Amino acid sequence: MNLGRLCRLLKPALLCGALAAPGLAGTMCASRDDWRCARSMHEFSAKDIDGHMVNLDKYRGFVCIVTNVASQUGKTEVNYTQLVDLHARYAECGVRILAFPCNQFGKQEPGSNEKIKEFAAGYNVKFDMFSKICVNGDDAHPLWKWMKIQPKGKGILGNAIKWNFTKFLIDKNGCVVKRYGPMEEPLVIEKDLPHYF
């Protein structure tokens, strides 16, 4: 029996356990591979740029753009500028942007979360910034592991994130509907947004 099927079979029992014994629920399914059981982005959590844990279920009903960011990349200015523009024009329509700093590509995000937050403020960022993470390898954040194996989240020449500013479009149900490579500027996503409002 594969892990995905096992998770689907056990999920109702785990949910009942969580309802009956909330203190125990966090320890019942805490293996490194829990992310494989997820059916949507809404089943994950991540620390925001200030270190507070955020349940991504808060994005249920919103169309989301999830991206890895870096402050010292050659693509930083165009990506931050266009992400800020998209947020300004589409936030009222229900679009949310989730930016995850990452230092795995050319060590182009070396600063602390505090420094990254200051940098983003220089672009007048109003979208959600998260704490620095890894997006590839064993230490990758579970959300990123999950997005990369989704049918519409797979990459070209393998599923690994290739560089800064890889973007995922997530529908209102928390499912990956498209992946955009690092060379694709954020405004490319604009043409796809109306399909998911």
UniProtKB/Swiss-Prot annotation:
Keywords (A to Z) from UniProt: Cytoplasm, Developmental protein, Lipid metabolism, Mitochondrion, Oxidoreductase, Peroxidase, Phosphoprotein, Selenocysteine, Transit peptide
Phosphoserine carried by residues: 40
Active site, renumbered: 73
Keyword match Cytoplasm: yes
Tissue specificity remark: Expressed very intensively in the testis and weakly in lung, heart, and cerebellum.
Molecular function as annotated in GO: glutathione peroxidase activity; phospholipid-hydroperoxide glutathione peroxidase activity
PANTHER family in UniProt: GLUTATHIONE PEROXIDASE, PHOSPHOLIPID HYDROPEROXIDE GLUTATHIONE PEROXIDASE
Record-given protein name: Phospholipid hydroperoxide glutathione peroxidase
Protein source organism: Macaca fuscata fuscata (Japanese macaque)
